[in-house]
A protein has these predicted regions:
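Detector for methionine-enriched segments
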Residues: 1, 47-48, 76
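Intrinsic-disorder/low-complexity, polar/charged segments enriched in Ser/Thr/Lys/Arg/Asp/Glu/Gln
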Residues: 1-5, 60-62
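Compact, glycine-rich, soluble single-domain proteins
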Residues: 7-48, 52-56
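C-terminal structural segments of small proteins and small subunits
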Residues: 52-86
Length: 86
């Protein structure tokens, strides 16, 4: 199990457009991916779950990966987060 922590930099927060791109991107990975915001945890591969968090700007998030290819997944997700400006 590995994790990646980051702060949301988009002034609108984690809204539908980048969330959709991120969710679609992570579906390629076989490992289990959890997005954690405060005490809430959702499946990062679930669009409804991610949007249900209502993540504002400057929020601190954690992505937890568990299973096959977890290191590669987090490395690629970190790059994608930067690319999307989340």
């Amino acid at each position: 199990m590995r994790s990646l922590k980051f702060k949301v930099s988009d002034p609108v927060g984690l809204y539908a457009t980048p969330a959709t791109e991120l969710v679609n991107f992570v579906k390629q990975f076989p490992c289990h991916l959890i997005l954690k915001y405060g005490s809430k945890e959702v499946n990062l591969k679930s669009m409804m779950g991610v949007l249900s968090l209502g993540v504002p700007t400057k929020a601190e998030l954690e992505i937890i990966a568990d299973g096959e290819g977890e290191k590669r997944a987090l490395d690629m997700i970190e790059d994608k987060i930067s690319e999307l400006g989340i």
